[in-house]
Amino acid sequence: PETRISDKLPLQLGNPELDKEERLRDLLVNTGLTEIVSYRWTTPERENRRLPKDSPQDDKPHLRIANPLAYEKGFLRHSVLASVLDTAERNARVRDRLALFEIGPQFFGSENPDGLPEELHRLAIVLSGPRSLPGWQPADAAAMDFFDLKGILTTLLDGLRLPEVRFDPGEHPSFHPGKCAKMTSGGKQIGVFGELHPLVRGQYDWPV
């Protein structure tokens, strides 16, 4: 025999921010990207590879872990992009084509010793290798470039239905001058993308 529960079920409260993040993941996977989840732990030296050596480095202090397993896991990351580049570097040893993304937090310490740290969620995408994988049909062997990434981002922004989206020339120390663009929606910058700076590319052991 079955007996119905007499009490009403509790009201289920939604999480709009989590719903948006899941929607973002679905759209990115639908464009053919693979999601990764990397460690939040790193070192300042490893993270700084995403910037040219002669450019200004992070001006905010890294958050140091009190009792890390090892020095390599002794700090909380400043950049999701640095984590995805590290993962791509390892995977490039066994795969010719990479199309990766990660959505996750990056952490910044406060200059005030009594201040609370800051946690920001960011999206990073890395493309490398041929546009298509070899198969029984002829494939496009040309390398993915700036415009492949722009196409993915255009599809993403269309799916999110953001208003007044624009792509304009931009600048970022990680990216090649003249091959970098910023994205704005409603006059507010929402992202930046481009081809990796040659000086950054030289610090990674893979054909970025």
PLM ranges: what are they?
Residues 1-208:
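Extended beta-strand-rich architecture
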